[in-house]
Amino acid sequence: MELGLSLGDAVTVADGGRLELVLGLGVGVGAGVRRGEEEERGRREDVVGAGRWAAMAAASPEPSVRLSLVSSLGLHWPSETGRSEAAARGFDVNRAPSVAAGAPGMEDDEEGPGAAPALSSSPNDSGGSFPLDLSGHGLRGHAEAAAQGGGGGGGGERSSSRASDDDEGASARKKLRLSKEQSAFLEESFKEHSTLNPKQKVALAKQLNLRPRQVEVWFQNRRARTKLKQTEVDCEYLKRCCETLTEENRRLHKELAELRALKTARPFYMHLPATTLSMCPSCERVASNPATASTSAPAAATSPAAAPTAAARTAVASPEPHRPSSFAALFAAPLGFPLTAAQPRPPPPASNCL
């Protein structure tokens, strides 16, 4: 089954009886070509194509399907020579012209209109064409596929080697599994000294049936865990201290605000001036009596001592007087009232002051 796709050109049949798949794109170029002429030519090409298709169907025993798409859109622009000419470009996928020959054809087509018909790849082309070598692309595609296959084999080898390296690295980085006895012994050793010198490391590795590097890595991890735990404890302590200080600061700010409010507000009490206490006369006498008694007591204590000396001095100085007779003394004594006892003095009235 053969498929023919035609856009503006007729389908051609090769000498071997096979159907050529021709992709033709007819674009009318020219300012003076009218749309009616383009449509008339399209109808003629359709009639010619239908006739050739019927002849091919009668000659070929195999069924075939034909798809014809005729473009009725004409884009016109003036050429370099100033005249209008119709140019149709076709792609012949069954022929194998060289790409190098097609490129000069394009250059000649641009340079002058006379060289274009000579390089036309199809008898139905009127303006010029450029062939496309798909067979070369196919060969090149096969070569690239082969190269990719070879490169894929090399890439597969490289990927396999990389996978083996990754497996080795993973086995080397595999986590160390220790028994309970080994873990307990390492913990006791870590409590005694957290760092090991080379001799201690080798001795501990021999004792636990491990490599020195494994012992060193275990101690490094243990120190890291210890440091991390200590850091967490310190962070918690600092967090609590910060919370306590925050509460204290809030409380102090509150007290300061209250004191400032009391200072700026008007006071509710009045300052009373200092007063003098008055005393009644009786209280003054009572208060003054102890003072006079205390001042007179030393004077009384000193006066008896001085009295004998004065009496002795007067006794020595004055001679003893002549005593009269008792009879003369009796009549010479003056008469007076009889002696009576002294009346006591009434006490002063009590005062009413407190």
From Swiss-Prot:
One term under GO cellular component: nucleus
SUPFAM superfamilies: Homeodomain-like (SSF46689)
DNA-binding region listed in the record: 171-230
Domain of life: Eukaryota
Compositional bias annotation for Gly residues: 148-157
Chain positions covered by the region annotation Disordered: 98-175, 294-323
Assigned keywords, A-Z: DNA-binding, Homeobox, Nucleus, Transcription, Transcription regulation
GO molecular function, one term: DNA-binding transcription factor activity, RNA polymerase II-specific
Coiled coil region boundaries: none
Cellular location(s): Nucleus
Stretch list, region Leucine-zipper: 229-273
Gene3D superfamilies, sorted: Homeodomain-like
CDD domains, sorted: homeodomain (cd00086)
Reported tissue expression: Expressed in seedlings, roots, stems, leaf sheaths and blades and panicles.
PANTHER family: HOMEOBOX-LEUCINE ZIPPER PROTEIN HAT14 (PTHR45714), HOMEOBOX-LEUCINE ZIPPER PROTEIN HOX27 (PTHR45714:SF22)
Family designation: Belongs to the HD-ZIP homeobox family. Class II subfamily.
Entry function: Probable transcription factor.
Protein name per UniProt: Homeobox-leucine zipper protein HOX27
